[in-house]
Amino acid sequence: MAKDKKFVEDITPMDEDFAQWYTDIVKKAELADYSSIKGCMIIRPNGYAIWENIQKYVDTKLKEYGHENVSMPIFIPENLLQKEKDHVEGFAPEVAWVTHGGDDELAERLCVRPTSETLFCEHYAKIVQSYKDLPKLYNQWCSVVRWEKTTRPFLRTTEFLWQEGHTIHETKEEAESHSLKILNMYSRLCEDMLAMPVVMGKKTEKEKFAGADDTYTIESLMHDGKALQAGTSHYLGQNFSKAFAIQFSDRNGKLEYPHYTTWAVTTRLIGAIIMVHGDDSGLKLPPRIAPTQAVIIPVAQHKEGVLEKAKELKEKLAKVVRVKLDDSDKMPGWKYSEYEMKGIPLRIEIGPKDIEKNQAVLVRRDNREKTIVSLDEIEIKVQEMLDTIHNSMLEEARKARDEKTYVATTMEEFEDIIENKPGFIKAMWCGDRACEDKIREVTGATSRCMPFEQEVVSDTCVCCGKKAKNLIYWGRAY
């Protein structure tokens, strides 16, 4: 047996250094690597395969809803970006500019797209004339560039992958309904695929997307008590339509401006998976999003019949799950640690004694429970166990979030919680931006959302003591 040249390295305990724990998992689980360009990353096959599964879910849903995929240019002329004032002001600090083509200075600077509203609007203005042309439901899978000052793989990078949807509608009601429909789909993605519970709600005026009338969001809570914005959907009203002169003849022959929505999820969802589910042994992947759902590890594979049986088992299971057989010459113990670190949801062990008894041993990654199953029932048992693992991981994440969700009715309580018990803080707000600004200045917490499911935890604003208007989820965030 060849000597193993690579051994599973220890991962920094999350309680010791959460940021280093996260970085260790990204690198050791081979999800991504650093690029020579500051703030950019190389998404490795293990990481990209997770993104592909996210893509598959979202793309299927969007097509069910009637969306079509398109591809817009990566460059935006400066004059086009300037057309919507609030929008350009919101993105100006993060824009990367192209000033030369070869040795020649360009007559006009080109922006490397930070987002594509301006390109879609320019196109829609050319192709929409009548209400019969509406709605237009377009989506794009691409990368965008935002020149971030502080970066971390998946969570905040200079270039990242996303999907961006851009739709225009005949009426405000239709556009708002569509925006919320997409948000609900994102929520289902997180809970049904990523086993990650979210809070759905609306952003405050201060936190909404630049140029939007309303921004809706799904917010999740990480192991360290910080919030992460997992996806957003924006109702842009007629702001962009007017700025770009997109008009259509309505049912009475009158010229009107369509109502616009835009929405996105990004590769930061991979970072969320790490920080919601991971532990000190490494990555812990929810089964439905895992590129490999089960790994077969033959025990004493040099003995007669073991490898043959393992291959037969793989062939059988490949019809129902995404399965891998590791028949390398590394020791079984090394393989156990390796696949535990990489987060494979289910390990299947089979050796000579198992073959004699017509059985295999299933080991769950989420809680390390072992179950012996008959080979005659293994296809259905593996599928059932993967569903059980998903439900267990979702429930565990929901329990962890709820245990770190607190209520504050005064600033003293708020400050004590944020410093000593990081998590979501539910607190009432008067609606005054000055209070929102003060809370951020004093505590570093931002308003994450006004949840759709409102409750009253106090009659007064947590900051100023005046009559409260809304419950807000607050927290420090990525």
From Swiss-Prot:
It comes from the Bacteria. It is found in: Cytoplasm. The keyword Nucleotide-binding applies. The keyword Nucleotide-binding applies. GO terms for biological process: prolyl-tRNA aminoacylation. One of its GO terms (cellular component) is cytoplasm. It holds the Pfam family ProRS-C_1. InterPro entries: aa-tRNA-synt_IIb, aa-tRNA-synth_II, aa-tRNA-synth_II/BPL/LPL, Anticodon-bd, Anticodon-bd_dom_sf, Pro-tRNA-ligase_IIa, Pro-tRNA-ligase_IIa_arc-type, Pro-tRNA_ligase_II_C. Belongs to the class-II aminoacyl-tRNA synthetase family. ProS type 3 subfamily. Homodimer. This is Proline--tRNA ligase. The gene is proS.
